[in-house]
Every structure is written in structure tokens, then in C-alpha cells.
Design a protein with these regions (language model features):
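Alpha4 helix (beta4-alpha4-beta5 surface) of REC/receiver domains from two-component response regulators
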Residues: 65, 86-101
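Acidic catalytic/metal-coordinating carboxylates
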Residues: 36-39, 62-65
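Two-component/phosphorelay signaling modules centered on CheY-like receiver
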Residues: 14-32
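Active-site beta3 strand of CheY-like receiver
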Residues: 47-53
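Receiver (REC) domain active-site loop signature in two-component systems and cognate sites
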Residues: 58
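C-terminal output helix
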Residues: 89, 107-117
Length: 129
């Protein structure tokens, strides 16, 4: 895959979305944003991102429920979960549901770079099938 990756960031924190957007744009990604799970599901359906970075803890529709719906719709899409400390059981559940990996908050630029590379590899792998 030679083109830009289109990544959907889903987090209820506007500040975190802004920081993630900046990190992803430095890595030459096109960035979409959603502030909750319901919006993420709609954007996944309408804008077909290459990958998703998804917070676990959000109001209304949480990250786990969002992951389940997105994976039902598009089982191949790579999803990286974001989590705060103390959510290890939830993280295990997300991996069982098909999340590619997770990043613990606070994250580093290197972790975001690695996440983008994981998404890129998965997209290329899916494309080669």
C-alpha cells in the first residue's frame, strides 16, 4: 500500500483527539475523528477508514461495544485500543474480540508510530488476500 492511511480516532476527549491527530498527521495519515462509539460506527460505514484507534472507556456506547459492532460489519479492519490504567481485563476482552493491539495512556509518539505500522501491515496483508 503506497498511499496514505486513513485512520479514524475515537475518543470522548477532544484534547486527546487533537494530540492524536497531530501525531498521525506527522506520520502522513489522513485523520477522521469521532467523539463516541455511535459516531465511530457511522463513520466506519460511510468513510471506510483503513484502521481505527479506539478508546475503551467512553460514555453511551463504550469501546468494547463499538469494537463488537465494527468487527461484525468489517471483520478485517485493524483496530488499536486505547486504555487508561486499570483496564487490563477489558483489554484482554478486546483482543479476544479481534482488536489488533492496545496502547496504554499516556502514550508516546513511538507507540503511535508502531500502531500505524501495525495498521499498515494489516491493510497490506488484507489487500494481498
Amino acid at each position: 500500500m503506497a498511499g496514505k492511511l486513513k485512520i479514524l480516532i475515537t475518543d470522548d476527549s477532544k484534547l486527546l483527539r487533537k494530540k492524536l491527530r497531530e501525531e498521525l498527521e506527522k506520520l502522513d495519515c489522513d485523520v477522521l475523528e469521532a467523539e463516541n462509539g455511535k459516531e465511530a460506527i457511522m463513520r466506519d460505514l460511510t468513510e471506510q477508514p483503513d484502521g481505527i484507534i479506539l478508546d475503551i472507556v467512553m460514555p453511551e456506547v463504550g469501546g468494547i461495544e463499538t469494537l463488537q459492532v465494527i468487527k461484525d460489519i468489517n471483520p478485517e479492519i485493524p483496530v488499536i485500543m486505547l486504555s487508561s490504567a486499570g483496564t487490563s481485563q477489558k483489554l484482554k476482552q478486546t483482543l479476544e474480540l479481534g482488536a489488533l493491539d492496545f496502547i496504554q495512556k499516556p502514550y508516546t509518539s513511538e507507540q503511535i508510530k508502531q500502531a500505524v505500522e501495525q495498521i499498515r501491515r494489516k491493510v497490506e496483508e488484507n489487500h494481498d488476500k
